[in-house]
Amino acid sequence: LGISKSNLEFFNNKIINIDKIIWKLKKIDIFSDNLKNERLLNFENKKDQLFSILKNFQLYNILDKSLKKNKYFKMININEKENFLESYDIVISTDCSSPITKKYFTKQILKKYDSFAHTTIIEHKKIINDTATQIFTKKGPLAFLPISNNKTSIVYSILNSKNCKNEKIKDLIHDYNFKYKIKKINNVESFELKSFSLRSYYNHKFLAF
């Protein structure tokens, strides 16, 4: 995940401090496949970070642990409490795949983009790793997002690549890498790119966010 400096400050001050799980980036370089190693754009803040990178599961674990300690928070398994909804004047659903959303918000808009995002983490020789890199390749955008001085997250979005083999993705990463001395490319995970929205966000006492 990427988070801007202002949003990070808000999160730390108003929700919970997450400084221990972020990696600060001071620069973004943008390249084009046609111009080889010539920069199209670059954004830089030499004194402070432009934004930060963090792992989704680490953020989830911190929030989950904090909520469980909160005396005002209670976790309920709705599969075990069939009639619990009747006890509330307002019910808010924040999960598009939850039983509440599926039952009370049936009019939905799903758009598919015929693209898949392929993600992995590369392990490489230690460097000062505070610059994110985006390359607009002929196959789609490829992002190198540092998460430590010797590890970098990769996100490669490729059109019509549902059946693209992991070894092919790894070969493309090697082809476009001009910065890191890669020691290992970890397992590649693939996700279909699509957007989901509701036609209505309220239904009687039920709200969706």
Regions found by a protein language model. Name each.
Residues 72-78, 187-196:
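Short gly/ser/thr-rich secondary-structure transition/capping motifs
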